[in-house]
């Protein structure tokens, strides 16, 4: 059940109780309960596929759990990225973001109308003036004098240039659209933000701006992120979803790691001691049975019950989290000279993006390409892949085969399963080989049959 009529209990803005959900007879999670309190900044962590985004959908009312309740306090507005996806056809980047303040624009229009009516000295002037003063006060108290400057500040903070602000929003790349949707969410007026990987597509300066925004944000935020440094900078609580259950900790990510290590060490020590005790008791049971007297069998039965109770109460320490393990092995050996670029230049709409780029890569080198958003890093990759034409010379060495990982992954068929998507790319592989390859990237069991979009 999703209920927005709940009276807040203490400082809680949202309460989740006993959430449970399954997909295709597979239990995703159960007994999930937690509170989000005023000014909480919560890091929500867990391995991919455990259900973090699914819980966000439940909290925002987009998905109903099989069991459990979500209570939201009165006057709490939840902001979730998917609610702000998509842009209007004819809007610029600036006007698209400004649209979240449409209520201020309506106030401005009414204030102009009231001013015109008052100027005519019509009847009911006292009523008109009273309405004007009330509306003006409401406009100013709610931020009407600063919303345009806040719009510009958010765009600049997230890496948009002055020129970008005047571009049609529909011409933005996938990464830029994600940033624009993030800006819309941040400025939406929501007082409880659900942020799912908010640092994706952000450069260092933009991440720093986002950190500052969240620290100053007077509402609460729950943040899914794999960026531990970002979580350390902005969070004061941590929730971990693991093996279908949720555990809450006070403190940021680093503090969570230390606490969890201590808990696991204590649990491992207790587990080992209990295993020793069970073996000791079972040794007594075996000995009593060998002695074979009636009173020995009574003692053996009593001790066996004691051992069974200990076994039932055993809590096994959590295994170390699985990590992705793979090696990059070229299908053939290249020459020593892998890539040479000379005087690469490219312009868009008559404006140079970059020029005079020279590059020489040799076999065995690992190169990190660093630069602000919009400076042309992805464009350079697309030039190398032949997707953009540029001035200058590009020469690949002997036996060089290029692999390209696109940040948007536009070539993926979201309706296919992970298994079929990889198998279609490598039809000569057996299903076992494909599933083994997927397993190295932690696609286990039925996960390989899920549509890519999930």
Residue ranges and their predicted role:
Residues 307, 314-321, 325:
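Intrinsically disordered, low-complexity regions
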Residues 121, 286-298:
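Short intracellular "coupling" helices and adjacent cytoplasmic loop segments at the cytosolic face
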